[in-house]
């Protein structure tokens, strides 16, 4: 039925086909190898450290993978509180200010001041502008500066500052800080 030439051709053709198919995915590699590597795109001139005491310097992980299994990946850097001692020192240099505590959250600065004249609560707009100028001189990324001489706010800010500098967990502290700020500055954006 089949001649010797046909049998010989099919015997030679089958291994040739098998060899050809085996090389088809050369260089493809695995798509789900979870090859994670650290990549640092930080610019030291703009590394969001702002001369403060709370320095969380964590590199971002980058995953070169088609299936990177990211579920509930919050990577929320907005929940960062920093004590701005340099700004507080500059604000305290003002003759109207006896003491200042400043916490920076993102591009917002919250300033609690004890005034030399003993006034508690309201701070004059002129003085607020001077304070804001001093704060922004230490950090060009600050968009809004909120100032209060409310005794309760001053006390809370001192406590928050100590907790941040001591490295207390930020989750509960951030929520508590946010509630306090919303109560003292209800019109803040």
From Swiss-Prot:
GO biological process: sporulation resulting in formation of a cellular spore
Intracellular or extracellular location(s): Forespore inner membrane
Lipidation (N-palmitoyl cysteine): 21
Record lipid sites (S-diacylglycerol cysteine): 21
Induction: Expression is dependent on sigma G, and to a much lesser extent on sigma F.
UniProt keyword annotation of Cell wall biogenesis/degradation present: no
Record's bilayer topology term: Lipid-anchor
This protein's record includes keyword Signal: yes
Keyword terms of this UniProt record: Germination, Lipoprotein, Membrane, Palmitate, Signal
Region described as Disordered: 24-79
Knocked-out gene: effects: Mutant sporulates normally and has the same resistance to heat and UV radiation than wild-type spores. It exhibits no defect in the initiation of spore germination, but the spore outgrowth is slower than that of wild-type spores. Mutant shows a reduced rate of spore germination in L-alanine.
Record-level GO cellular component terms: membrane
InterPro entries: Spore_lipoprot_YhcN/YlaJ (IPR014247), Spore_lipoprot_YhcN/YlaJ-like (IPR019076)
Compositionally biased residues, Low complexity: 51-70
Domain of life: Bacteria
Signal peptide bounds: 1-20
Purpose of the protein: Probably contributes, directly or indirectly, to early events in germination. May play a role in spore outgrowth.
Entry protein name: Probable spore germination lipoprotein YhcN
Gene: yhcN
């Amino acid at each position: 039925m089949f001649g010797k030439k046909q049998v010989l051709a099919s015997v030679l053709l089958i291994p040739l086909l098998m060899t050809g198919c085996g090389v088809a995915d050369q260089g493809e590699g695995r798509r789900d190898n979870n090859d994670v590597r650290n990549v640092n795109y930080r610019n030291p001139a703009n590394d969001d450290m702002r001369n403060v005491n709370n320095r969380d310097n964590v590199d971002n992980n980058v995953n070169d993978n088609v299936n990177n299994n990211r579920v509930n990946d919050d990577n929320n850097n907005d929940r960062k509180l920093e004590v701005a001692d340099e700004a507080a020192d500059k604000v305290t240099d003002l003759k109207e200010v006896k003491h200042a505590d400043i916490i920076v959250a993102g591009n917002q600065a919250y300033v609690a001041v004890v005034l030399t004249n003993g006034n508690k609560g309201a701070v004059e707009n002129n003085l607020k502008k001077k304070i804001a100028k001093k704060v922004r001189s230490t950090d060009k990324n600050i968009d809004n500066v909120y100032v209060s001489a409310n005794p309760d706010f001053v006390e809370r800010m001192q406590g928050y500052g100590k907790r941040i500098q001591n490295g207390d967990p930020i989750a509960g502290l951030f929520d508590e800080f946010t509630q306090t700020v919303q109560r003292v500055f209800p019109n803040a954006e």
